[in-house]
């Protein structure tokens, strides 16, 4: 079905629109040009990852190697100086695909030149040092480590610097916090008695700020003279000996003081004595000596190497408290401490405003560049410590070899350790770090969103226990930078966020998020100028107008008071005072949220669910783009590189399922350069299009022939005769492609160039009407006009001059690649042979795209009505058509590995001669039918649970008694199986899995000893790829884009489904009660507009928050399109004025109409990754917890199902006493009872039960509360069996506490 792209509102580029006579803001004339909504291009969605990694390569590596390594003893020394300007990268040993298959790192070896120098030697030796294996970011923006795709999250942390916290309303305590880049936090607080305290983690308890200021070298008189309101500090003198607490007196006695310290030395002794008093590990009886106290102070409390503010922290000190220290001085100084004290005193007298801790102005964004730099420094530090330990064991004399410096020989022997420590540190970050995560590859949107995720958790951030409601909340500075909608549900709500579509990380200074704004000059919005990129700090000074204000034709704001944001608060102001205006709604939301049509009609909680569930949609076998979209569907596919695009201009010569070949001109530009001035001048003069954009034109200018072109022909006449075919003007809008500025026919130019260079006997062209084909998916929108399809005769590669005119580019397509979530990714070509493509044009679709658009669901006919209770509580009733026609069928891939191990009795063997037990031989021989002569399953085989995939046997102890009986030995000899004792350890299909064997990969062994002991060409490791085809079934989870989700409860034959007046049966029946309480009305508007699009053969691109163009704009639009569809299709039931948007639907079982009109239409429904095949689980018996002796939980561990309080109530309501008794005893923690139950089942006797361990536990707990519970046993006899059973009787009595004691 061919759909014509239709715009429903103003949009981002010049786009052709169909006539819509609804309300203000919608066009009324066909083919008109709409004004540009904002003149900026959306940044690449994955560049936030690429730029971060590029920053590490360009700047981070050089920064890490600035300082040399120095080692010295009394007689020898060694200096290792790095030259970061000469860093070299070696080509990766494996390609990205090979790294995934072999389980390796897709990385590059890093080398750096180093200079080895010694003070006692005049030689300066330069050599290359192997730094380590650095994982390289792929083109898609992720890493491959150990064969697994991983993505690095961005982290939002607090800026280093100084912060004034608000005074607590109850305790009236003010706090000033100093946050260094390196080192512990410093708190300066004031208590109720106006005493000023200094607190760090090293001191463990707070001390007087006066003492610490004295310790850093500030005299008494300077403190009181330089500080304003310094009288408060007089309350901070410590009490004299005997007037304070006992511990305070101990501190003074140990320091040798009787009162407050008077000198700097006494302050050191007091601080050291205070530390020993409250330290659990220090000797408290030793006196504090001056030298020891001084060393303690400068090594622990005031270590300049640990109190590093960094450039950002120093800048904050200069801006907030007026520090005069230069930016180059990044350490905390005593002047900083004194000015911080002044800031706290000003806060107490209300002369200073507190800082907003949760504002983005106080935070910065860390990417993979900082993380890789940190772990590089960690690896270098580990090597330095390792080398220093080696140095300590060197002899004090010269080396045995002669006069050579022993440090040099030690360096040569251990420099390989440098690369090991650095490589391990980098690998540890990706594999065990919380910020290097297993990439979500469920679909293209999931991958894009995962790479644009931001978290406040992780090392250097906050922990889940420290979170507050303020941290999880939405701050005004999030506007245009972080999406207020998309965040996880549950414990991480508000802690993990997503970047908005237009937000970009700043490149210089503090890594903050910037968002664009239009400049406003005297009330006129400057949309022709590039938007300003504004940081959160700069936004405080702006007066911003919202994006939904209606402008005049000259982009002038209305002359009335307008709603604005001033200092991040809502105000109203006149247009002449406004400085900026927001660029659009995409400025406020993330990528996933922007894909929800009619977002403004949904509750924010449901929009959150819709954003998250789109990431969980499984790619389907037949992907289909939505009828109602928002316009970003192409960008998601294009930016994440999940589609094949042409890298060169040319025409397609060969198309197959595995590759596409494109023939590109090499010297065409040079051969037609003599006509360049003629071509462009003609293009300016000629405005008429060769082909009508709405209908096929067969005018005489449309068809022409060029016959027998000779090299000596009149080229001018030839050119002018074909000028109308060379170029055509696009009448709808200007393309913004990378390789072309106008729509022309370059294939004709290429053919003419061939004619000019040599004779071609005959070449003819003709026009053909062609439906829209996707162009460049990296651009926001594409043309809706019909393109000219040029074909020619006798086009073969031998017709052209080799290596002069054409060059062939081959594009390999990905076939059946497994993702991290076990979904299947494949690329399929969409263009036929002999098709001309431009650079950037789409050649092939991915697993979750159709015609270059994100396609993660299906457009199906839905109806909102209750149906026999089968859609109660969000359950979903679906038609058998969805199963038969594989509408919601998806492909899933799993791989199963098996490797040969080296046992104490020899190597295991992969073979098809497997020793079998005689009791299982018949069944197992049938299960082994797919194995070949090597013991590997054949590719293309259909396998079911229990089938053999790889045959393997493990040797047993030859001296041990045989496990096989004599007749089993004879049986194996007859079948010519192994005579020695082997155990069957083959790889078999797990339970609940069935599918086709897609591939068998023979891989090298990962254990060196196995490879050394094995024979040549022996199979040591095998990976079997299994492809499953899963149809929709009862228990699968489905959802829409508006947070409407449910579980399939029944699959009904299509003849029983409700049907429309034209006889079309409904595909899905949803419960209408799920709409009002959830307040997601957007699904109703989507399904009705989809119904109109289905009958009109149109696709719609809606503009979010379209109420700016008029009241009830969305509803007016839907009704107008339904009315138009009813007129064009001559179906009045599509739009009935007395109940618009509702249809008389017939019951498929009776043929009668339902009592009330039903809302029905085409909605975009997703099939989520929560499939019932992965959830359903049965356990006959299994492992038990060692502590509670109850079944473990989890399907992966073959666990049981926990019965909670409400489940027990449900069974009690039905009077299922025996079922409950069984659940509480033998199926839980009745140790004796479950053993006896097995014996009774074997003996065909009734199952008896005992007392569970949980009952014994509660019995002991009650006895601990002085309840005397006594348990008795009662004998009962069955008529058939004589069986002793235990029946508990509980007499309850109270005892006195004295009796117990």
From Swiss-Prot:
InterPro entries: DNA-dir_RNA_pol_su2 (IPR015712), DNA-dir_RNAP_su2_dom (IPR007120), DNA-dir_RNAP_su2_hyb_sf (IPR037033), RNA_pol_bsu_bac (IPR010243), RNA_pol_bsu_CS (IPR007121), RNA_pol_Rpb2_2 (IPR007642), RNA_pol_Rpb2_2_sf (IPR037034), RNA_pol_Rpb2_3 (IPR007645). Its main location: plastid. Belongs to the RNA polymerase beta chain family. HAMAP family: RNApol_bact_RpoB. It catalyses: RNA(n) + a ribonucleoside 5'-triphosphate = RNA(n+1) + diphosphate. GO terms for cellular component: chloroplast; DNA-directed RNA polymerase complex; mitochondrion. In plastids the minimal PEP RNA polymerase catalytic core is composed of four subunits: alpha, beta, beta', and beta''. When a (nuclear-encoded) sigma factor is associated with the core the holoenzyme is formed, which can initiate transcription. This is DNA-directed RNA polymerase subunit beta. One of its GO terms (biological process) is DNA-templated transcription. It comes from Chlorella vulgaris. Its EC number is 2.7.7.6. Keywords: Chloroplast, DNA-directed RNA polymerase, Nucleotidyltransferase, Plastid, Transcription, Transferase. Pfam families: RNA_pol_Rpb2_2, RNA_pol_Rpb2_3, RNA_pol_Rpb2_6, RNA_pol_Rpb2_7. The keyword Magnesium does not apply. GO terms for molecular function: DNA binding; DNA-directed RNA polymerase activity; ribonucleoside binding. Transmembrane segments: none annotated. The lineage of its organism: Eukaryota, Viridiplantae, Chlorophyta, core chlorophytes, Trebouxiophyceae. It is found in: Plastid, Chloroplast. PROSITE patterns: RNA_POL_BETA. DNA-dependent RNA polymerase catalyzes the transcription of DNA into RNA using the four ribonucleoside triphosphates as substrates. The keyword Plastid applies.
């Amino acid at each position: 079905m061919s759909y014509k792209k239709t715009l429903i509102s103003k949009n981002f580029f010049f786009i052709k629109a169909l006539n819509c006579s609804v309300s203000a803001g919608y066009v009324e004339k066909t083919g008109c040009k709409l004004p540009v909504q904002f003149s900026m291009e959306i940044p690449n969605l994955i560049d936030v990852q690429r730029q971060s990694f590029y920053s590490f390569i360009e700047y981070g590596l050089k920064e890490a190697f600035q300082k040399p390594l120095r080692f010295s003893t009394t007689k020898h020394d060694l200096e290792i100086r790095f030259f970061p300007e000469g860093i070299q990268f070696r080509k990766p040993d494996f390609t990205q695909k090979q790294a995934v298959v072999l389980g390796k790192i897709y990385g590059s070896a890093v080398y750096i030149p180093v200079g080895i120098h010694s003070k006692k030697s005049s030689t300066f030796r330069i050599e290359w040092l192997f730094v380590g294996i650095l994982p390289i970011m792929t083109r898609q923006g992720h890493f491959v480590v150990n064969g697994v795709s991983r993505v690095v999250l961005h982290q939002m942390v607090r800026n280093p610097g100084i912060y004034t916290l608000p005074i607590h309303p109850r305790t009236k305590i003010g706090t000033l916090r100093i946050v260094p880049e390196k080192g512990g936090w410093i708190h300066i607080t004031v208590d109720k008695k106006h005493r000023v305290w200094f607190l760090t983690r090293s001191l463990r308890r707070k001390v007087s700020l006066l003492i610490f200021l004295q310790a850093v070298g500030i005299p008494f008189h300077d403190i009181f003279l330089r500080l304003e309101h310094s009288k408060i500090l007089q309350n901070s003198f410590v009490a004299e000996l005997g007037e304070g607490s006992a511990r305070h007196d101990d501190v003074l006695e140990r320091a040798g003081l009787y009162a407050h310290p008077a000198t700097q030395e006494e302050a050191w002794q007091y601080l050291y004595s205070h530390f020993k008093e409250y330290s659990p590990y220090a000797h408290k009886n030793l006196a504090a000596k001056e030298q020891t106290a001084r060393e303690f102070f400068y090594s622990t409390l005031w270590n300049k190497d640990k109190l590093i503010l960094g450039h950002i922290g120093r800048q904050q000190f200069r801006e907030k408290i007026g520090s005069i220290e230069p930016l180059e001085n990044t350490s905390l100084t005593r002047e900083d401490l004194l000015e911080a004290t002044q800031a706290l005193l000003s806060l107490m007298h209300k002369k200073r405003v507190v800082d907003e801790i949760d504002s983005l102005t106080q935070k910065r964004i860390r990417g993979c560049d900082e993380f890789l730099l940190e772990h590089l420094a960690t690896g270098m530090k580990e090597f330095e410590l390792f080398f220093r330990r080696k140095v300590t064991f060197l002899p004090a004399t010269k080396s045995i070899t002669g006069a050579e410096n022993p440090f040099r020989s030690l360096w040569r022997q251990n420099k390989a350790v440098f690369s090991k420590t650095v490589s391990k540190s980098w690998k540890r970050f990706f594999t065990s770090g919380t910020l290097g995560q297993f990439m979500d590859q469920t679909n293209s949107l999931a991958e894009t969103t995962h790479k644009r995720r931001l978290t406040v958790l992780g090392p250097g951030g906050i922990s889940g226990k420290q979170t507050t409601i303020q941290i999880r909340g939405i701050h005004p500075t999030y506007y245009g930078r972080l999406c207020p909608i998309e965040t996880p549900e549950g414990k991480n709500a508000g802690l993990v966020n997503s970047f908005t579509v237009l937000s970009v990380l700043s490149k210089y200074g503090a890594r903050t998020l910037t968002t664009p704004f239009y400049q406003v000059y005297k009330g006129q919005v400057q949309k022709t100028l590039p938007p300003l990129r504004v940081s959160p700090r700069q936004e405080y000074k702006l007066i911003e107008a919202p994006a939904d204000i209606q402008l005049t034709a000259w982009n002038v704001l209305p002359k009335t008071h307008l709603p604005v944001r001033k200092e991040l608060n809502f105000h109203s102001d006149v247009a002449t005072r406004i400085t900026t205006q927001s660029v659009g709604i995409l400025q406020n939301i993330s990528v996933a949220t922007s894909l929800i049509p009619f977002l403004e009609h949904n509750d924010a909680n449901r929009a959150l669910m819709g954003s998250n569930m789109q990431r969980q949609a499984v790619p389907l076998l037949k992907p289909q783009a939505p009828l109602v979209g928002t316009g970003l569907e192409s960008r998601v596919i294009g930016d994440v590189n999940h589609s094949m695009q042409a890298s060169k201009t040319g025409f397609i010569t060969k198309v197959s399922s595995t590759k596409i070949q494109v023939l590109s001109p090499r010297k065409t530009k040079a051969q037609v350069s003599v006509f360049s001035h003629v071509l462009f001048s003609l293009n300016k003069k000629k405005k008429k299009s060769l082909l009508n954009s709405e209908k096929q034109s067969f005018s005489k200018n449309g068809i022409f022939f060029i016959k027998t072109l000779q090299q000596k022909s009149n080229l001018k006449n030839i050119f002018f005769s074909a000028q109308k075919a060379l170029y055509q003007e696009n009448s709808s809008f200007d393309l913004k492609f990378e390789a072309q500025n106008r729509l022309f026919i370059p294939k004709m130019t290429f053919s003419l160039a061939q004619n000019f260079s040599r004779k071609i006997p005959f070449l003819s062209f003709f026009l053909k009407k062609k439906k829209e084909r996707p162009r460049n998916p990296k651009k926001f929108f594409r043309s809706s006009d019909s393109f000219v399809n040029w074909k020619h005769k006798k086009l073969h590669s031998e017709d052209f001059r080799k290596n002069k005119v054409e060059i062939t580019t081959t594009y390999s397509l990905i076939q059946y690649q497994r993702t991290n979530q076990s979904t299947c990714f494949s690329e399929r070509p969409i263009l036929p042979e002999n098709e001309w493509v431009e650079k950037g044009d789409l050649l092939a679709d991915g697993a979750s795209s159709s015609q270059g658009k994100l396609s993660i669901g299906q457009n199906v006919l839905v109806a909102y009505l209750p149906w026999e209770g089968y859609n109660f509580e969000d359950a979903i009733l679906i038609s058998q058509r969805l199963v038969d026609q594989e509408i919601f069928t998806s492909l899933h891939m799993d791989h199963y590995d098996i490797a040969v191990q080296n046992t104490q009795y020899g190597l295991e063997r992969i073979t098809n001669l497997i020793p079998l037990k005689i009791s299982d031989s018949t069944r197992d021989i049938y299960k082994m039918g797919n194995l070949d002569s090597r013991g590997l399953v054949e590719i293309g085989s259909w396998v079911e649970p229990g089938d053999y995939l790889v045959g393997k046997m493990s040797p047993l102890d030859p001296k041990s008694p045989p496990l096989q009986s004599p007749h089993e030995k004879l049986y194996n000899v007859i079948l010519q199986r192994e005579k020695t004792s082997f155990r069957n350890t083959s790889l078999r299909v797990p339970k609940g899995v069935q599918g086709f064997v897609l591939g068998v990969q023979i891989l090298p062994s990962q254990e060196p000893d196995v490879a050394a002991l094995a024979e040549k060409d022996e199979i040591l490791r095998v990976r079997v790829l299994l492809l499953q085809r899963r149809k929709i079934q009862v228990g699968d989870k489905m959802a829409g884009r508006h947070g409407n989700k449910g579980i399939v409860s029944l699959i009904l034959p299509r003849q029983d489904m409700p049907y429309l007046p034209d006889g079309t049966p409904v595909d899905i029946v949803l419960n209408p009660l799920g709409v009002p309480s959830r307040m997601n009305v957007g699904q109703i508007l989507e399904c009705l507009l989809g119904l109109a699009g289905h009958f009109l053969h149109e696709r719609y691109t809606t503009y979010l928050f379209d109420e700016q163009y008029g009241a009830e704009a969305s509803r007016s639009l839907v009704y107008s399109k339904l009315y138009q569809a009813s007129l064009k299709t001559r179906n009045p039931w599509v739009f009935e004025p007395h109940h618009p948007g509702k249809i008389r639907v017939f019951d498929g079982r009776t043929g009668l109409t339902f009592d009330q009109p039903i809302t029905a239409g085409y909605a975009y429904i997703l099939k989520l990754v929560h499939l019932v095949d992965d959830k359903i689980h049965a356990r006959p018996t299994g492992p038990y917890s060692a502590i509670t002796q109850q079944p473990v939980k989890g399907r992966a561990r073959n666990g049981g199902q926990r019965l909670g309080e409400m489940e027990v109530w449900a069974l009690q309501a039905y009077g299922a006493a025996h079922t409950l008794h069984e659940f509480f005893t033998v199926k839980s923690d009745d140790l004796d009872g479950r053993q006896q139950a097995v014996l009774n089942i074997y003996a065909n006797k009734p199952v008896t039960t005992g007392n569970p361990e949980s009952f014994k536990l509660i019995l002991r707990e009650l006895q601990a509360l002085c309840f005397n519970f006594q348990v008795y046993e009662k004998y009962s006899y069955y008529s058939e069996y004589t069986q002793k059973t235990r029946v508990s009787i509980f007499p309850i009595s109270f005892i006195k506490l004295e009796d117990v004691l």
